């Protein structure tokens, strides 16, 4: 696969999509689009805040959505109620287009509880599974710590890390399901094989 074939976009909620959404501007979540330009297929990582806006970006780029990937179950990444606000996400996305939602197996029940989607909408994965989009392979790496089923995605020497790893630290471990020991293991062991020259793409603009 050549770099010209890989489709990779980083969208900032509150700026690139969900413009004017107060919650999106406060949480500064990143949404990622990954696909194969040759086949025109793409998946979205953490489609919160503005599903229609995400589809509009894909349409402008002549890409078709074929799936969604969740780094973890928190509403600012997959939709649901948070701090008194209702955030749109995978449930609303599935109302617009029928695609599978890829989740880490340990977190499937949490995604259904938070978003209201059914288990039939989910594809549950183990660490090391690969989601293929055209000729683009995305490796799923289970990285518990922020939540029990947090996962990172590795594609073309790029690590889409969700809330596991940021530019200046790791995700919080003091929320329900957080585990500092698991986070330490995820960073020092599970992600240790990621090349030093890999580019990090975190879940929030925190740095």
Question: Which residues make up each language-model segment?
Answer:
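Short, glycine/acidic-enriched loop or turn micro-motifs at the edges of active sites
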Residues: 39, 49, 75, 107, ...
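Active-site-proximal beta-strand elements of phosphoester/diester hydrolases
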Residues: 6-15, 43-46, 137-144, 159-162
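Active-site beta-strand termini and strand-to-loop segments that position acidic
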Residues: 25, 34-38, 133-134, 153-157
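Metallo-beta-lactamase
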Residues: 63, 117, 137-142, 147-207
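Conserved S/T- and glycine-rich ATP-binding loop of Class I adenylate-forming
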Residues: 34, 71, 143
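Active-site HxH/HxHxD metal-binding segment of metal-dependent hydrolases
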Residues: 27, 39, 50-137
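Hydrophobic residues in well-ordered beta-strands that form the structural core
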Residues: 45, 101-105, 161-162, 202
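Zn-dependent metallo-beta-lactamase
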Residues: 1-42, 49-61, 91-92
């Amino acid at each position: 696969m050549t770099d010209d074939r890989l489709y990779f976009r980083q969208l900032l909620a509150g700026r690139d999509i969900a413009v004017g959404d107060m919650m999106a501007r406060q949480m500064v979540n990143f949404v990622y689009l990954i696909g194969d330009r040759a086949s025109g297929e793409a998946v979205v990582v953490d489609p919160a805040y503005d599903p229609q806006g995400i589809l509009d970006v894909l349409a402008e780029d002549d890409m078709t959505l074929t799936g969604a990937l969740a780094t973890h179950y928190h509403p600012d990444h997959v939709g649901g109620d948070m701090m008194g606000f209702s955030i749109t996400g995978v449930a609303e996305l599935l109302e617009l287009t029928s695609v599978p939602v890829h989740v880490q197996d340990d977190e499937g029940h949490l995604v259904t509880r938070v978003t209201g989607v059914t288990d039939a909408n989910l594809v549950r994965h183990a660490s090391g599974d690969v989601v293929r989009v055209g000729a683009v392979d995305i490796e799923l790496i289970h990285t518990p710590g922020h939540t029990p089923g947090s996962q990172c995605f590795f594609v073309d020497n790029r690590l889409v890390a969700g809330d596991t790893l940021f530019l200046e630290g790791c995700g919080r471990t003091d929320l329900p399901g957080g585990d500092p020991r698991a986070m330490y293991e995820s960073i020092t062991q599970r992600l240790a094989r990621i090349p030093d020259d890999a580019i990090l793409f975190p879940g929030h603009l925190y740095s």
